[in-house]
């Protein structure tokens, strides 16, 4: 968590404490509530910061060239909602930009990848759409182009396939052949020709792959953190009831449409931004809590500045679960990831 963010929420929580009156000794211990509109505005701002921090972004992506709808629909079918691969894994859909298609038989595809350095690639598949001009059997060879090279000998053969049907095809690529680009730019050359001896090939060469139309090629990548983190057991706690003054979980649903973020967050439509609130009598002090969380980190900072007596106990999260997101990054790639510790499931007294 960055220092400016801590200072921002420090100010907000101080405002909350002042609104609750001098009798309250902890910002989550109950007392007078904020007005509903003010509370909702605070929740929405917290949701924005929580999502950006969880995705390691400084600002929301600006989508200037969204992927074609047909290709995006196909890609989203590959990325179903739910948990991604174990070990803090991610799934990424990267759409191709055609940088050279002067020949009917050859195309150069450019992909702008945004794989974190702390992750490694372990699975890669290329999706291509074969046009109805398919002459019979097609021989497709996929090469990787090295950086700053233009000679024919600079390319490396990754895969070779024979195709006999039109429509979408998925081609597995060796993940080892796609690693090592520090710039994040990957270039693949497709050499697509009718199989030699095919009697149906007549006349001028015709384009066989849809590389620039609505069926845009894309890469399906799976990446995993180098040092997977351990999972946490899930625990639940009752939600706050109107007549319950003790520490409990207060539930808020945040719709991404309300945030104005539906253009880059594809799934889900929203999530539960829960937080902990209520009184912590002395006999509840020291209940299990999570020290290294966004919620309790701010409270710990406040307590370190000694605004309350040393014996004060605060209502903080004791269990969290991840949030699975499908979103478009700054390069227009579709990313599927589980953001850890996003949804509060249980609360307790620190």
From Swiss-Prot:
UniProt keyword Glycoprotein, yes or no: yes
Localisation: Secreted
Alphabetic keyword roster: Cleavage on pair of basic residues, Disulfide bond, Glycoprotein, Growth factor, Hormone, Secreted, Signal
Result for mutant: residue 215 to H: In a breast cancer sample; somatic mutation
Main location, first listed in the record: secreted
GO CC terms, sorted: collagen-containing extracellular matrix; extracellular space
CDD domains with a match to the protein in the record: TGF_beta_INHBC_E
GO biological process: negative regulation of adipose tissue development
Pfam families: TGF_beta
Propeptide residue intervals: 20-236
Disulfide linkage: 240-248, 247-315, 276-347, 280-349
Outcome when changing residue 62 to T: In a breast cancer sample; somatic mutation
InterPro entries documented for this protein: Cystine-knot_cytokine (IPR029034), Inhibin_betaC (IPR001318), TGF-b_C (IPR001839), TGF-beta-rel (IPR015615), TGFb_CS (IPR017948)
Matching SUPFAM superfamilies: Cystine-knot cytokines
GO molecular function (one): growth factor activity
Residues of the signal peptide: 1-19
Residues carrying covalently attached carbohydrate according to the record: 198
Stored PANTHER family: INHIBIN BETA E CHAIN, TGF-BETA FAMILY
Function according to Swiss-Prot or TrEMBL: Inhibins and activins inhibit and activate, respectively, the secretion of follitropin by the pituitary gland. Inhibins/activins are involved in regulating a number of diverse functions such as hypothalamic and pituitary hormone secretion, gonadal hormone secretion, germ cell development and maturation, erythroid differentiation, insulin secretion, nerve cell survival, embryonic axial development or bone growth, depending on their subunit composition. Inhibins appear to oppose the functions of activins.
Summary of subunit composition and partner proteins: Homodimeric or heterodimeric through association with alpha and beta subunits, linked by one or more disulfide bonds. Inhibins are heterodimers of one alpha and one beta subunit. Activins are homo- or heterodimers of beta subunits only.
Protein family per UniProt: Belongs to the TGF-beta family.
Name assigned to this protein: Inhibin beta E chain
Gene: INHBE
């Amino acid at each position: 968590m960055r220092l400016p963010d801590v200072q921002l929420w420090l100010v907000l929580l101080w405002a909350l404490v002042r609104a609750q009156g001098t009798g309250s000794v902890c910002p989550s211990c109950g007392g007078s509530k904020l007005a509903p509109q003010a509370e909702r505005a605070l929740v929405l701002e917290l949701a924005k910061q929580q999502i950006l921090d969880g995705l390691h972004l400084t600002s929301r992506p600006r989508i200037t060239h969204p992927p074609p709808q047909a290709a995006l629909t196909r890609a989203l079918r590959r990325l179903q909602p739910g948990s991604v691969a174990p070990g803090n894994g991610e799934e990424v859909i990267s759409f191709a930009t055609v940088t050279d298609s002067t020949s009917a038989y050859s195309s150069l595809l450019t992909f702008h990848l945004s794989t974190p350095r702390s992750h490694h690639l372990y699975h890669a598949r290329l999706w291509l759409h074969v046009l109805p001009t398919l002459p019979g059997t097609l021989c497709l060879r996929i090469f990787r182009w090295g950086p700053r090279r233009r000679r024919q000998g600079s390319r490396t053969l990754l895969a070779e396939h024979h195709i006999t049907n039109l429509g979408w095809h998925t081609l597995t690529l060796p993940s080892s052949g796609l690693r090592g680009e520090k710039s994040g730019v990957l270039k693949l050359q497709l050499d697509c020709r009718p199989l030699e001896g095919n009697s149906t090939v007549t006349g001028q060469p015709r384009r066989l792959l849809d590389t620039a139309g609505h069926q845009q090629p894309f890469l399906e990548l799976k990446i995993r953190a180098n040092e997977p983190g351990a999972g946490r057991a899930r625990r639940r706690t009752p939600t706050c009831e109107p007549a319950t003054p003790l520490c409990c979980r207060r539930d808020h649903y945040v719709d991404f449409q309300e945030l104005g973020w539906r253009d880059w967050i594809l799934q889900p439509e929203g999530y539960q931004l829960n937080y902990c609130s209520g009184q912590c009598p002395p006999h509840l002090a020291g209940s299990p809590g999570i020290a290294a969380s966004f919620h309790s980190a701010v409270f710990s900072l406040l307590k370190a500045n000694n605004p309350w007596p040393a014996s004060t106990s605060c209502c903080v999260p004791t269990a969290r679960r991840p949030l699975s997101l499908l979103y478009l990054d700054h390069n227009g790639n579709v990313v599927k990831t589980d953001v850890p510790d996003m949804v509060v499931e249980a609360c307790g007294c620190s």
